[in-house]
Amino acid sequence: MATPNPATGLGAIATGQLSVVGHALPWAIAVAFFFLAGGYLSFGTQVLIWILFALSLDLALGYAGIVTLGQAAFFGFGAYAAGLFAIHVSSDPILGHLIAVAVTALFGLVTGALILHTTGVTFLMLTLAIVSVMFEYANQATKLTGGDDGLQGVNIAPLFGLFEFTMFGQTAYLYALVVLFIWFVIAWRVVSSPFGRSLDGIRQNPRRMRAIGTPVWWRLLAIYTLSAAMAGSAGALSTHATRFVGLSVLSLFTSGIVAVILILGGIRRLYGAFVGATIYLLVQDWSAKVSPYFWEFIVGLMLIATVLFLEGGLMDLGRVMRSVLGRIRKADSK
Amino acid sequence: MRKLLSGICALGVVAMTGSASAETFKIGLIASYTGAFATWGTQFQNAIEAFQSIHGKSVKGPKGEIIDVQLVYRDAGSAGPDKAKQLAEELVLREKVSMLGGFELSPHAMSVADISKQAKVPIVVMNAATASITRGSPYYVRTSLTIPQWGQAIGKWAAENGIKKVYTITSDYAPGHDAEAYFHKSFKAAGGEIVGADRTALRETNFAVYMEKALQAKPDAVYMFQPGGSPSISFVKAFSERGLKQAGIKLLGNGEFAELYLPHFSDDVIGTISVNHYTETNTRPENKIMRDQLIKQFGEKGVTDIASVGAWDAMALIYIALREHGASADGLKYIDAMKGKTLASPRGPIMIDPEERDIIQNIYIRRIEKVGGKLQNVDIATIPMVKDPWKIDNPVKR
Amino acid sequence: MLSFALTVLLDGISYGMVLFIISVGLTVTMGLMRVINLAHGSFAMIGGYVAGYLTQHGVDFFLALLLATVAAGLLGALCEVTVIRPLYRKGELAQVLLTIGIVFVVTALITEIFGAFPYRVEFPVYLTQPLDIGFRTYPAYRLFLILVGGIIALILWLLIEGSLYGAKLRAAVDNPRMARAVGMNVSLLFTATFIVGTALAGLGGAIGAGILSLEPSYALKYVVLFLVVVIVGGEGSFKGSFVAAMALGIIDTTGKYFVAAAAPYLLYAAVFALLLWRPQGILPPKSLA
């Protein structure tokens, strides 16, 4: 890569084009939401959790080009780890969160080491197999996971001994926001580092990267593990915020939806996760009132349109509109 | 000029009702309208609307005030309990409901226990039947049934009526476990032998394997427990497809054979014995009122089932509680109002257990017969005023 | 004991036949066009729903099957021309996501039209009864599946090994560049094959409705099974998909009989182990082996 292309998210950050205002805006909105949300606060927490989840996928899928449909395995692993820790060991949220992230990272490391040498459809199938194994196992291990009934009795102690997790959701929201911010900074640092740039190269042409001596497999393993840790963190957040873990955290559907969210928002943008998660959850919430399955139809169409016409996702909408308008103007002037 | 007149009239109406000013009492109803358990939402809603057509959409409170009883319906989509919990939070925080109701699935009912405690909101369970639900929070009251009431009744009846060996195939979730446990207990206590027991996945629709295993064990009867709807229909189809009926094995069931589902079965089910707390075709006057109203309002779709009677009686109890305490009382006061109350329900006499806040009612054993060209459940035995056996076996530790 | 073992085997084979009929189209198109098509289950689902609708309204069973097959094939043609063709050149990710989008759209439409309750195909009475096969009775339906599956497998095998179309197909799978170089109309081949594949899926969905029950979540629920057959068998390998389908059917059924609770996750664990051992599948076509 000679000069960073300002059009891509990576390039934009690299060339400093995303101004301070641009960066501050999403966080300002998130903080403002806390004060204005009223009864919608727990909805906001859900959005934050899905943003983190999608962000984790952006690292693996968007930047490193690891086409996985198994991200829910890490989300679910982190969620159950946090829940089981709270029930059997300690209900302290910070400790539980750290443990959940650690064990999920380990899980990511092990599975990544096993499967990252494969590519294409075989790799995809392996990721699907992992999620399926975990889902089916959790489904029948009812003594451990509660099965279909879900993990009951998850009590989370107040954060720092002071801030209780109630159904009104204030603690959960701020907690999720802080966790998301920390991970975002980590992700940003990673993708703008030389390591991150090498991932870009690996995604585009792994053979060439190997030829110049890059340890491709190790780099992929590293980013896969980081991505797993982030997804596990999102899962732990989910458990702490809702004080409940259901089988859906491990479902194939969840795995698919997070990929959908990322594509809709725009991959390799980091902020694409923000846009995608917000739009998706809003669409789902709004259209659920119209009809319970209408949102599936809308999301399906959006997905098809995005793949065919809007490769950079919704974040790219501005650029695409401008180029379309530009072409129209050129045709007019002829 | 006309506008001015109608404006004055409107003011006058408001002024007149002002002294008995309208308050609103909002109830959030969480049930499934889509997915595998899609019938429950509609059944609850139809029964509630029918009830309100007869008894009115408002109640008079203790001070004579008019209380508008409003229902807000949400679809749990036959999804996991986290969905039900999320909907409950939304209903309490956004819609500001003062009471939650519905819940056809036990995991859904159980998931809202801590919301009831934090928001101090009563939960009226209109179907979910796992015995331990009402212990989850002092805000639970149930108007439907507990599975042990069913399992115990049919286990005992089977052993006392010539069935010696039974193979049980029950669904792998809390109500299924209850059914299996209590059938086994009462069947064995009355001298019967359990020759095998299998648990099937909650949304299983392919029962070939289980039928085959049952056939190999050569029982006198198979006891099934499946959620009503597609799993039970597939189960019964597999039962005759795989030759169990031909082998002379009887089928014992529960709510799978409600009147609502009978049209989906072939004549193969004639002779099937089932246990239930509501026989739809009973001739009680209260039942006639409910059934007639439902047919009047919903035509063919007005078939009554245990969802209808659970919701109907729940509304009756809620109206009683509102009459006693008004629209803005503390949640526990409404629960207190319902404790110990007896009602002449369309199903028979019922009482809300004052200690457990759970239902005490008649349990009926029925056989499927062809009456007037249609498949129908016909009562062959009644066990009066059964208290939940699980509560008796597991008293609250003092 | 022997009769029990035979029953388990027959159950497994009949299940495998359904998986084969549905998945064979997918393995050929994935091997031929190198497109990951997660929407393949939707064609099976549509075939099933069409057959269900027709048989519930009194149409003759075999006519309904024919119409279901044709309907799925037509929809396949429509899809191929409009949304699948642009995918040939785009990467895996685009293919995965666009076909997921198709699944969502189809699922929502099916729910809207037919409702969320499982949908029944009305099989003729003689197929819903057990048949006396000598030493015991066995469901006629399952025997029917084995018969139909066997016939289709035979026809396809003769087609692929013995006909000109089959030869072209094998050539294009083994070496697409060479195939184009010798002047084969590869895009016509793609379209024709895609249509045959989706039509077969529609047939499989229709006759398999007694095992893979029809409901709106069909396409999402069973896509993993179809992908397992394709990938474990080896993309593009007809023989591989047959073997994989049989293996999947028998292992899954046997598992349910003996280790009922553990069966599902043991199955996926086995798939995982197998793919690590043989990433190209157990019987991959020549160019990939």
Description of each model-found segment:
Chain A
Residues M1-K334:
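Transmembrane alpha-helices and adjacent helix-loop boundaries
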